[in-house]
């Protein structure tokens, strides 16, 4: 078998930058699947992507499929011939369909009888014949929500396609993909290098495109180059570039030949809160802000040009000119907003409807205020500060700055609160009310901030469930799943002594008569319990551990977490599997008992040595684990219970639980019930696999 390297390049108009990486990775996965289906072995497959191209490089690809013998089984010999030994119509039809006569068919003996069989030698197809159709199928399966047409044909793709190159080593694979006939043409940079050139070999793709076309097609290399050059540029001016991963990926998807440059803006703009300036630079202009070593924003930014200019100063000046009006707008909004206190904007919240059935933003702020004060009282934080922060929590939505730069909500509330002389805890809580904003984001840690962040999310959950708008399927327009995870994370990560039942009840109560769903509290609790499972699964916790804890329905998230950790640890113990199996056996036995289960153990009725030993061991360990349960030290309690394994095993080996003597039977059931109850203080261990 021969092997060669394959290059596939699809040359397009500018591709959507935020989708570029996903498109390339999907193309790679889809084509890899095609190769596997076609039984074409290969060594590796790499993807390349730039604004005007998607490419794959398959290393060590077989140049043809292997020849193989195809076995096609026909009817059973018994039904293939009649009583006179003549072929039946079924046998003749099968043979005709395979291009043979019944007499030419072979016979296959199996343990289920003898069958007619046709074995054919099928020659493998050359890879060059298969690649065009495989490429088309791989492209057809790309995640393209809105494909477009171009020209006069009916072909659809995410952007118009101009070139298709298929090279197997130095051989051009002839074929049509996306309505374009393949050739050797590779298009270079729009403004530098050769506008197009002919590629002689698949292995020369990256080098030729870089040297002749002035395009770095390797996405990862381009991204790494931008990051390294931006860090160097920031270091030159004594700072550190703020290189957010998502922005770096977007910038790498916008340029083919990255040139990193440093620009400057007037220092007067530094009087504006840094977050607003950073939002403008990152969100609108795709610039990297620069911070000093002590975390202060510097009057500089780093940007990436898509051209190597003879006069970079002109490009720098152009970018400085573009960003200046945006920074001036931020300065104007900030200075205008400062003329009014946050508290003075409370009345204007009455003009904005939060949700038709749930009232205005002012109604929402008042509910958050009351709920935050309630929560703060339970966690030892200032109820007064929490209530104040809750009341002001939505006031910055009415400021010019937040209306223009929406992502600064909360953050601008903090800055304006400080200018108004509000307590620092109040100001910080205004910023942290929306945390965590995304997976991996930090949670608030200060008591007042926790109270307000929890209140903000619980008000949303209780309200939306209360009007019957719970998430359905993948749809979640109110981001309730994120809110639920936020509630759980804040409580668990801060070890707050809060019970979900109490919090939800208070949140529902504060909505008053607005809620039409009488089951809102129960549904919110079930929803949060369901998010527990999703959250722990994302953290790599085994599903059976989660289900074991969920079976006990602990409604204090911090307590729930302690149980998860304890059961996860217990699962690693040598005795765990045997005790889980024993618990399952006990559970099945007790489930079959009709009527009320006996609860007290009569030592006088313990007749077998094994049941006496188990009862004694249980009596010995119970006073040890009782205070551990009370203190929530579940891990140590389960470790102590693990010592029962030997006694439990011996009990089931020697003792007949369902004895004919009812008194003996009830006493043994009481012993097993007592044993199971000890484990149930933590979780249903019988659910462990």
Curated annotation (Swiss-Prot):
Known catalytic reactions: tRNA(Gly) + glycine + ATP = glycyl-tRNA(Gly) + AMP + diphosphate
GO biological process: arginyl-tRNA aminoacylation; glycyl-tRNA aminoacylation
GO function term, MF aspect, one: arginine-tRNA ligase activity
Gene3D superfamilies in alphabetical order: Isoleucyl-tRNA Synthetase, Domain 1
Entry similarity comment: Belongs to the class-II aminoacyl-tRNA synthetase family.
Subunit: Tetramer of two alpha and two beta subunits.
Record's protein name: Glycine--tRNA ligase beta subunit
Encoding gene per record: glyS
């Amino acid at each position: 078998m021969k092997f060669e390297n394959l290059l596939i390049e699809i040359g397009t108009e500018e591709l959507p930058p935020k989708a570029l990486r996903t498109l390339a990775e999907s193309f790679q996965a889809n084509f890899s699947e095609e190769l596997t289906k076609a039984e074409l072995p290969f060594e590796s497959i790499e993807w390349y992507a730039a604004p005007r191209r998607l490419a794959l490089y398959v290393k060590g690809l077989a140049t043809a499929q292997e020849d193989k013998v195809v076995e096609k089984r026909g009817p059973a010999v018994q039904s293939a011939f009649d009583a006179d030994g003549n072929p039946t119509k079924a046998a003749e039809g099968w043979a005709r369909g395979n291009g043979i006569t019944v007499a030419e068919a072979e016979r296959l003996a199996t343990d289920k009888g003898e069958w007619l069989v046709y074995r054919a030698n099928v020659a493998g197809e050359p890879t060059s014949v298969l690649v065009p159709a495989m490429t088309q199928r791989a492209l057809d399966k790309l995640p393209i929500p809105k494909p477009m047409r171009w020209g006069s044909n009916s072909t659809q793709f995410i952007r118009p396609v101009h070139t298709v190159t298929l090279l197997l080593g130095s051989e051009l694979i002839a074929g049509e993909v996306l309505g374009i006939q393949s050739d050797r043409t590779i298009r270079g940079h729009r403004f530098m290098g050769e506008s197009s050139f002919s590629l002689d070999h698949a292995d020369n793709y990256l080098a030729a495109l870089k040297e002749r076309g002035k395009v770095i097609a390797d996405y990862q290399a381009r991204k790494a180059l931008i990051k390294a050059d931006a860090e160097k540029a920031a270091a030159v001016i004594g700072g550190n570039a703020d290189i957010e991963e998502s922005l770096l990926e977007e910038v790498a998807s916008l340029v083919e030949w990255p040139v990193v440059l440093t620009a400057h803006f007037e220092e007067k703009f530094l009087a504006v809160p840094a977050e607003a300036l950073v939002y403008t630079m990152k969100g609108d202009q795709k610039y990297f802000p620069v911070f000093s070593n002590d975390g202060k924003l510097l009057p500089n930014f780093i940007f990436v040009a898509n051209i190597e200019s003879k006069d970079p100063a002109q490009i720098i000046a152009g970018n400085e000119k573009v960003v200046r009006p945006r920074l001036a707008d931020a300065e104007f909004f900030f200075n205008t907003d400062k003329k009014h206190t946050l508290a003075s904007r409370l009345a204007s919240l009455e003009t904005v409807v939060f949700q038709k059935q749930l009232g205005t933003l002012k109604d929402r702020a008042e509910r958050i205020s009351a709920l935050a004060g309630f929560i703060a009282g339970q966690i030892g934080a200032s109820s007064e500060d929490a209530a104040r922060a809750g009341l002001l929590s939505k006031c910055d939505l009415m400021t010019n700055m937040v209306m223009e730069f929406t992502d600064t909500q909360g953050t601008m509330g903090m800055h304006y609160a400080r200018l108004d002389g509000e307590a620092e805890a109040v100001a910080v809580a205004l910023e942290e009310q929306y945390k965590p904003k995304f997976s991996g984001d930090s949670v608030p840690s200060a008591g007042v901030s926790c109270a307000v962040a929890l209140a903000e999310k619980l008000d949303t959950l209780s309200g939306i469930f209360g009007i019957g708008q719970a998430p359905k399927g993948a749809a979640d327009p109110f981001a309730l799943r994120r809110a639920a995870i936020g509630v759980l994370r804040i409580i668990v990560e801060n070890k707050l002594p809060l019970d979900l039942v109490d919090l939800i009840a208070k949140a529902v109560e504060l909505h008053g008569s607005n809620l039409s769903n009488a089951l809102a509290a129960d549904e919110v609790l079930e929803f949060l319990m369901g998010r527990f499972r999703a959250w722990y699964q994302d953290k790599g916790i085994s599903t059976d551990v989660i289900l074991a804890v969920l079976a006990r329905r602990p409604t204090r998230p911090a307590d729930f977490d302690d149980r998860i950790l304890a059961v996860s640890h217990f699962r690693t113990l040598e005795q765990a599997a045997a005790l889980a199996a024993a618990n399952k056996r006990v559970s099945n036995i007790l489930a079959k008992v009709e009527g009320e289960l006996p609860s007290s153990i009569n030592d006088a009725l313990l007749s077998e040595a094994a049941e006496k030993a188990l009862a004694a061991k249980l009596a010995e360990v119970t006073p040890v684990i009782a205070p551990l349960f009370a203190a929530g030290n579940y891990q140590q309690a389960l470790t102590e219970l693990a010592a029962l394994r030997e006694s439990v095993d011996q009990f089931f080996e020697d003792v007949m639980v369902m004895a004919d003597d009812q008194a003996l039977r009830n006493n043994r059931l009481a012993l097993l019930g007592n044993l199971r109850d000890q484990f149930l203080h933590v979780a249903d261990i019988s659910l462990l696999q």
